[in-house]
């Protein structure tokens, strides 16, 4: 398995110089020096080694009618299990969605005698997890890497296609801090390049121990 991961990583690195030229729109540019290439390699290695994460993140859904913003706590495994709890706004606070990889349940942990509902998966929910981005990145026929110069520092930007031909979820971009190696934000674009979902990470922890009970009722 490790050999396969390294082979995939090597293949992506070999094509890096070919794809950066077409991924520099929207204030992005290609890696300019050895330090930025090294940061990219470290970030890629981090992605391939990620097994679990815990995060506090703001999730914003945008449409032609406006936007809806939620504060969330996320737990996820690369194997597909996840848990997301909404902590704000107050009207949605306490809402929890869990997936054990087979079934998805929703409940509100602020309601006494809570009732759990089995629900269908939706890409609007599943694609907000970093683990989904990593899986798409590994499986994409074409991926790209760019660099963004921001007031807070230099960010490496990874891009991957989202499978399924969803009209509003076409491309995902992940901004990662070159110094901390922590994800800063994940943005999902529609086919016209409009931002549809923006996930902003406030606290992010890699490869934490997650109890199986987090993903079950």
What kind of region is each of these model predictions?
Residues 148-217:
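Gly/Pro-enriched, hydrophobic low-complexity segments
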Residues 10-18:
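Bacterial N-terminal signal peptides
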Residues 1-9:
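Bacterial N-terminal signal peptides that target proteins for export
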Residues 27, 31-32, 48-49, 102-166, ...:
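Flexible, processing/modification-adjacent segments and terminal tails
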Residues 73-128, 194-197:
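An acidic-aromatic
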Residues 58-62, 85-89, 107-109, 161-163, ...:
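A generic structural motif
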